[in-house]
């Protein structure tokens, strides 16, 4: 009995590490997602592709392109032809940090096995965020991420497909006639 209990405990303790290993693969990762956000009474949704390679994260959908690398973020707003350059403070947490498990501020509360999946409960105390990451038990690949901030903001990300790939065709956009806003200080 003790051996079985210890095995369950050890396997649960590695679930978050398994998730991190999968999405932070040296090959890179391409994730097709459906993204839903509700803020007070307003709800929005979109579908897009998340590219992860080393410390670079890109999210692309029909309305925007977001690239995060080395603490700098570039957002291309396609419908209004606008580019915004900004930097992220070390204390800030991005949605990319949550999706990749790439931040020390993420605290793991529990790991629960449910229907051949593992639900990783987490919180980010400094931002009032609580959430869950659902992963496949076999390989640690994520299937769903849900988090809530202060009851007002809820984000639900369904992962439609995911693959580790050494090469991916990143989208390129001609922004020569776009308005540029530079917020980098």
What are these regions (language model features)?
Residues 114-116, 124-130, 138-185:
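Non-transmembrane domains of secretory- and envelope-associated proteins
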Residues 39-42, 66-67, 125-127, 151:
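Short glycine/serine/proline-enriched coil/turn segments at secondary-structure junctions
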Residues 27, 50-58, 67-73, 114-116, ...:
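Short, solvent-exposed coil/turn segments at beta-strand boundaries
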Residues 75-132, 140:
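Surface-exposed, polar helix/loop patches in the mature regions of secreted/periplasmic/lumenal proteins
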């Amino acid at each position: 009995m003790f051996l079985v209990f210890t095995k369950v405990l050890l396997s649960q303790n590695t679930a978050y590490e398994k998730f991190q290993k999968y999405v932070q693969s040296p090959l890179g990762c391409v994730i097709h997602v459906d993204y839903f956000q509700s803020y007070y009474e307003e709800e929005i949704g979109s579908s897009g592709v998340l590219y992860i390679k080393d410390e670079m994260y890109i999210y692309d959908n029909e309305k925007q392109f977001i690239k995060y690398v080395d603490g700098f973020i570039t957002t291309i707003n396609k419908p209004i032809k606008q580019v915004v350059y900004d930097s992220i403070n070390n204390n800030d947490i991005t949605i990319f940090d949550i999706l990749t498990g790439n931040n020390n501020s993420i605290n793991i509360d529990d790991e629960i096995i449910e229907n051949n999946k593992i639900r990783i409960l987490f919180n980010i105390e400094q931002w009032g965020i609580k959430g869950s990451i659902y992963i496949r038990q076999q390989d640690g690949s994520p299937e769903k991420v849900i988090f809530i901030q202060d009851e007002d903001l809820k984000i639900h990300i369904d992962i439609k497909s995911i693959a580790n790939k050494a090469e991916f065709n990143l989208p390129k956009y001609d922004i020569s006639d776009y308005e540029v806003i530079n917020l980098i200080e």
